[in-house]
Amino acid sequence: TLTNEMKTQTVYLSRSDNRLDLETDTTYNRYIPVGTRPYDSVVVETGASVKVLGDNGTEFVFTEGQEGSYFSNITFALEMGVDYTLEITTSSGTAYTSKKVGLKGTSEITNVYAERATSNSGVDGVAIYVDSEPGLGASEYYRYTYDETYKIVAPMWAPVDFKLTNYDPCALPEPTYDLEIVPREVQNQVCYNTVSSNTIELASTAGNPSSKVSKQMVRFIGRDNFIISHRYSILVKQLVQSADAYSYYKTLKSFSQSEDMFSQVQPGAIYANVSRKDGKDENVLGYVEAVGVAEKRLFFNFEDLFPGEELPPYPYSCSLETAPESHLSYCYAGPTPPESCPPSVIE
């Protein structure tokens, strides 16, 4: 996705793998990037030559950073009225080119807000909505992405720590040491995590004379989801798409939501806008698009929407365990008792 933001633009290249591993390919973990692990059915394309050409004579060269990810050598932003083409030459010499793409329009997000709501499945939670107005050009088709950041507070945390000095684990008959309880030097009770969206959220105002977006939900979070336990922030991006790009993502979303491959409603084929330069027939997946981006950030606390209510449960089971202070000398030559679990404090 190329944008009108002045930034380092990025192109991702990979190849599909015919191998199917039902265990690894059907198990999703939101905290592990999909597609870049050795056992995923995706092989990143390395060593390629990548550039973007504008019909106004501009040329932007990309250099591979991490494997399969190519970054523009300079920051640039797409311009209205200019059509762009992505050109790729693989390390084996095969050349690909995209159809011409250009900005269709821009928009302005006028409001991002959260309301307590109930989902279609009856779950109590928070709905995050967007209102926007059209800007330049034709703004009728939209895609939404977001980055959410949330505060994590460790439930069992102490402001003190152990300080161990003069420790001799091999002393006989018992280890020798000095152990003090001191204030904790590192404040690690509170931390923050940021997660990017992994769903396809679309909206269309085609047929609406005003082209305004009103109360478009981009995220729903269940009331028991710990990410809203304390402080929560979401940066919403609204991408103005072309009709073709909107159709592509709509079909892709249909595939991702089709739970039964034998259901009566079958998603259509996914057509890419990239092909081989030599005209040879080859299935190419993916889509190069040019979008106008608008963004806005929202903050809220759990108390803002659920005043006086109990916080969501912490996602991990934490329990207090008692450990012995010392241990058997490492140089003890007699019968060895079973190791303690958890290990001793001084270990």
Segments from the language model and where they lie:
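A sequence/structural signal for flexible, mid-protein segments enriched
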Residues: T1-E347
